[in-house]
A protein has these predicted regions:
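ABC family nucleotide-binding domain
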Residues: 2-3, 8-25, 29-210, 214-217
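C-terminal segments of enzyme domains that contribute to small-molecule binding surfaces
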Residues: 223
Length: 223
């Protein structure tokens, strides 16, 4: 397994009240597979995803990626690994409003520290935009895009640096059923063809057919 968590716990304290959100979660992700996390609101599924992605720190437990304990690394080294090897897609596309589709992806390559030349970066961006069906919109700004188009660009941005892990938190929440299926078909195709390990949180049961594994969170644990 390329990615795993071991006994992840997370508590939040408000005043004198402490609430344990995650109660010792063991999770594994495999390349070329979509793992879907489901559960009721407040079950801890989004908290688990953000901790796995390094966007939150656990109260205790270990996160292993590609044979390394991320918690044992320096913060700088852990950030570098996340920038190079992790991709993120969220409910909202979070596109930069004043950048074109092409520029969104070029910025991602720069952020990830891509070793490619400027020419190679543009070629890679063009290839990925074509892959997600948005090559004809490379000069478009977010304001002129539909919700489905924005999410396709967000997915392209998340994979342009060839990450090994993709974290997707409710990636279809803002889309209608038709666009949701299109986005899931795209995620499924990219997960397989690029051999990415994808972890997805969703509340839409009809989309679970696109997942290779479905895990249920209940009361801070994997049921």
């Amino acid at each position: 397994m390329i990615f795993s968590t071991s006994n992840i716990k997370k508590s939040f304290t408000t005043g004198e009240v402490s609430e344990e959100i995650l109660k010792g979660v063991d999770l594994t992700l495999a390349e070329g597979e979509i793992t879907a996390l489901v559960g009721s609101s407040g079950s801890g599924k989004s908290t688990l995803l953000t901790i796995a992605a390094g966007l939150q720190t656990p109260s205790s437990g270990e996160i292993h990626f590609d044979g390394q304990d991320l918690g044992a690394l320096s913060p700088e080294k852990a950030r570098q690994i996340r920038a190079e090897s992790f991709g993120f897609v969220f409910q909202s596309s979070h596109l930069v409003p004043f950048l074109t589709a092409e520029e969104q992806l070029l910025l991602m390559l720069e952020t990830a520290g891509s070793p490619l030349s400027t020419k190679q970066q543009r070629q890679e961006v063009e290839k990925i935009l074509d892959e997600v069906g948005m090559g004809h919109r490379k000069s478009a700004y977010p304001a002129s895009m539909s919700g489905g188009e924005k999410q396709r660009i967000a997915i392209a941005r998340a994979i342009v640096h060839q990450p090994k892990i993709l974290f997707a938190d409710e990636p279809t929440a803002s889309l209608d059923s038709t666009k949701s299926r299109e986005v899931m078909e795209l995620l499924q195709k990219l997960t397989k063809t690029l051999n990415i390990a994808t972890l997805m949180v969703t509340h839409e049961e009809d989309l679970l057919t696109y997942a290779d594994r479905v895990l249920t969170m209940k009361d801070g644990r994997l049921a």
